């Protein structure tokens, strides 16, 4: 696999993480740089690990994963999206969600897992190609780290101007992404 192909693959696998991070940055209002880096680290680690897991599973688990991956992605993304919508509409004022629950590592991890299901499927497909899976996984992880950290900072700027609206849009986008994954797999 050429370096250009690896770069395109890494960017493609990172787009969902970027979009979610923009929404997260907007929802949190004024996330600190350390929080943006933490978000990037979690997304990067999960996005790097899932193609490795998929690759290792290869042919053995592909039929099992293929049968349920869309339900897992839908459940995680829709759950996090609904959580964001409820949080946006339950606030009485325009303050950001700075509560411990809003900054929960578990919410962040669930979101990262939801956006990385496709990377696991890519990992399964890479098992049939002559690629260095470690290089590919590290590229995906590094790109996800950069795009997620940057997305949090972009979301911070958007959130200061649009606050609740940005959180609603992000929640709807997550629910829509989960639904699109489900529909795509059910109609195939």
UniProtKB/Swiss-Prot annotation:
It is a multi-pass membrane protein. Its main location: membrane. Keywords: Cell inner membrane, Cell membrane, Ion transport, Manganese, Membrane, Transmembrane, Transmembrane helix, Transport. It is found in: Cell inner membrane. GO terms for molecular function: manganese ion transmembrane transporter activity. The chain crosses the membrane at residues 3-23, 41-61, 70-90, 104-124, 126-146, 168-188. InterPro entries: Mntp/YtaF, Put_MntP. Probably functions as a manganese efflux pump. This is Putative manganese efflux pump MntP. It comes from Xanthobacter autotrophicus (strain ATCC BAA-1158 / Py2).
């Amino acid at each position: 696999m050429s370096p250009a192909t690896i770069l395109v693959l890494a960017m493609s696998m990172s787009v969902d993480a970027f979009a979610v991070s923009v929404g997260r940055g907007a929802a949190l209002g004024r996330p600190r740089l350390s929080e943006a880096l933490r978000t990037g680290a979690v997304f990067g680690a999960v996005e790097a690990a899932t193609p490795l897991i998929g690759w290792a599973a290869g042919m053995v688990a592909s039929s099992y994963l293929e049968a349920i991956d869309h339900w897992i992605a839908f459940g995680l993304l829709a759950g996090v999206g609904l959580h964001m919508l409820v949080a946006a509409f339950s606030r009485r004022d325009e303050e950001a969600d700075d509560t411990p629950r809003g900054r929960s590592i578990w919410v962040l991890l669930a979101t990262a897992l939801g956006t990385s299901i496709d990377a696991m499927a890519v990992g399964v497909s890479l098992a049939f190609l002559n690629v260095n899976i470690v290089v590919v996984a590290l590229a995906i992880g590094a790109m996800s780290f950069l795009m997620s950290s940057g997305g949090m900072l972009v979301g911070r700027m958007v959130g200061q101007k649009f606050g609740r609206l940005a959180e609603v849009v992000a929640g709807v986008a997550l629910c829509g992404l989960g639904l699109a994954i489900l529909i795509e797999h059910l109609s195939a």
